[in-house]
Amino acid sequence: PFTDVPADTELYAAVKWAYFSAPQITVGVTETTFAPASTCTRAEVVTFLYRLAGEPDVSGTALPFTDVAADAYYADAVKWAVANGVTSGTSATTFSPNDTCTRAQAVTLLYNAAGAPAVSDTVSFADVAADAYYANAVAWAAANGVTAGTSATTFSPDDACTRGQIVCMLYRGDTQA
């Protein structure tokens, strides 16, 4: 449905899946563009995961972060993410919703949303230390086809996660992992 997503790509299948899912995981940035190369914020990624989970009821759930307004579009998603161990924020009192979500953060949020399954594989990327907070998440994602590196030997954990990357990760995680 978007002019900037070629029909003969995996991205097209992922965007179509996210756009037509119920509840709808994401929409375009305009009626005709998806902006797959645009970066995602932490609020956007958590919101996509919350929608993928079916937007469960979070009424009565406390919002522990001072930087998330109760009426923010992502407030329920953040409540859900905290209550389900998907995130603990960037500190005890902040979530940093408008910060760009890195590839390491995105894959960790997906991994936690999947229940942080046991990982038997080791990380095969030179830029992912075995003791990095995201090492198990990267190993799980690579082993299950959720995401690959930015090259055969690098994952680029500190790079910004794009809209195209997160939608493909969600699609693969939901249909393959």
Task: Give the label of every model feature segment.
Residues 22-24, 85, 145:
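Glycine-centered, phosphate/nucleic-acid-interacting loop/turn motifs that mediate DNA/RNA or nucleotide
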